[in-house]
Amino acid sequence: MILEHAVLDVVPGQETDFEWAFGEARELISASPGFLGLELLRCLETPSRYLLLVRWESVEAHTVGFRQGPSYERWSSLLHRFYSPFPVVEHYASALSTSASVV
């Protein structure tokens, strides 16, 4: 599994519209082959900043399958207008993992 990480700085005052548009865009990405799930988190200290975490089967599932696929143009038209600046997207693989144990 690969984790896509993107910090999304949204134009202040556009957060509600962004979240609505993301709800629609989520349907596009979730139908993409190799998509495993996503989480969109809103920053508590900077309310116009979001952290997008997307789980993919591989980097290529994101960079080729989704970004070069038929849904990406619609994804872009829904979301890219909200970003200032445009986000840097990076991919991560697990180096170490732990979770809380239940007693």
Where are these regions (language model features)?
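Conserved catalytic motifs of the protein kinase core domain
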Residues: 1, 48-49
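Active-site-flanking beta-strand signature of metal-NTP-handling nucleotidyl enzymes
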Residues: 3-8
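Short hydrophobic/aromatic beta-strand micro-patches
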Residues: 9, 41, 53-55
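Short, surface-exposed ligand-recognition loops at beta-strand->loop->(often short) alpha-helix junctions
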Residues: 9-20
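Conserved GNAT-fold acetyl-CoA-binding loop/helix
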Residues: 19, 23, 69-70
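An amphipathic, aromatic/His-enriched active-site/gating alpha helix that lines ligand/cofactor pockets
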Residues: 27-36, 55-90
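Glycine-rich beta-strand-turn "strand-cap" elements at beta-sheet edges
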Residues: 39-48, 76-103
